[in-house]
Amino acid sequence: MADSVPGHVAGGGLQGFSVDAECIKQRVDEVLQWVDSLEHKLKEVEEFYSSIGVSNSGSIGKDTEKGRHVVGIRKIQQEAARREAVAAKRMQDLMRQFGTIFRQITQHKCAWPFMHPVNVEGLGLHDYFEVIDKPMDFSTIKNQMEAKDGTGYKHVMQIYADMRLVFENAMNYNEETSDVYSMAKKLLEKFEEKWAHFLPKVQEEEKIREEEEKQAAKEALLAKEASHIKTTRELGNEICHANDELEKLMRKVVERCRKITIEEKRNIGLALLKLSPDDLQKVLGIVAQANPSFQPRAEEVSIEMDILDEPTLWRLKFFVKDALDNAMKKKKEEETKTRELSGAQKKEVSKKRNATTKLAERKTKRSRI
């Protein structure tokens, strides 16, 4: 983030730049483009705080600023990887425990029809895939449970779902009066009974995972905020640097300009009387920038034109001109809007008057008849 101001000559300030007007203009354009990029970065920071409902860094930011809860991005990633590894190990333990239920069900005397995939062609079940969307059997489940290549089950609930699918497929395809239907129903009941005793362990793991995910989200937020706090601090420094550069450039320009005349000073003073309260506050800010001892918030404030330096006078001259021009433009727009509104109102009144006249004429004609 510690980019230097574009075109800045380290240790040389503006000495490496020609005093030629075109060179100064080009330099100003470079700095202004750089300021635009800073504003874009600042907007990203503001959007971040807006998205988490915090303005100017809330309690999280305060703790982060104190250094007590700063968590680096790399550390967050390492902690997340460690947490995932521990969670995966816990889930593997659960799936191993579930293996006991699986063996008990598959060793039951009614399990044999479901041990292997249905031989659709051999049994002539031509409509099987029209009824069954996802075939499932115990051998497929066993292979998935024992897979070592990363393609196996990641969660015990996946095994539970496939176990149910075995029985549901059999009950959906076969008639209720068939032996296969009866065996599937009997095994499903036994399986659900055993699962009911096992389920609390799964629910406890879900609670642990939920808490871990909340903590991970909080740590990620802390890391991101720490990054944005650092960015904000650097942006502040760079913006000050940019202001200094622009101030130097302005002084270079002023050095090439003529001095403000006494008449111009008087006109500036008179123009100040026409400014709005907001613009007057900006004027006081301009004076305060050039004169640190000036107190813009004092009860009584006076501006002595004769003691102001040339750069400040030129800034005031241009500011006052722009402020008055904008005020005049705004006034003209309001007058135009008022005239348009007045014209519309007059048309409406005229329209109503004409309607009233026509109505009166109709009544007169009727009375004559």
UniProtKB/Swiss-Prot annotation:
Organs and tissues of expression: Abundantly expressed in flowers. Weakly expressed in roots, leaves and siliques; and undetectable in 5-day-old seedlings. In the basal rosette leaves of 21-day-old plants, it is more abundant in leaves 6 and 7, which possess narrow elliptical laminae, than in leaves 1-4, which have round laminae, suggesting a possible correlation between its expression and the formation of elliptical leaf laminae in mature leaves.
Pfam families linked to this entry: BET, Bromodomain
Residue ranges of the motif Bipartite nuclear localization signal: 351-368
Record carries keyword Ribonucleoprotein: no
Region (Disordered): 329-369
Protein's job: Regulates differences in leaf patterning between juvenile and mature leaves by controlling differences in the development of primordia produced during juvenile and mature phases. Acts by activating transcription of the myb-domain protein AS1, a gene involved in leaf-axis specification. Associates with the promoter and the start of the transcribed region of AS1 and up-regulates expression of AS1 through acetylation of histones H3 and H4.
Name of the protein in question: Transcription factor GTE6
Gene that produces this protein: GTE6
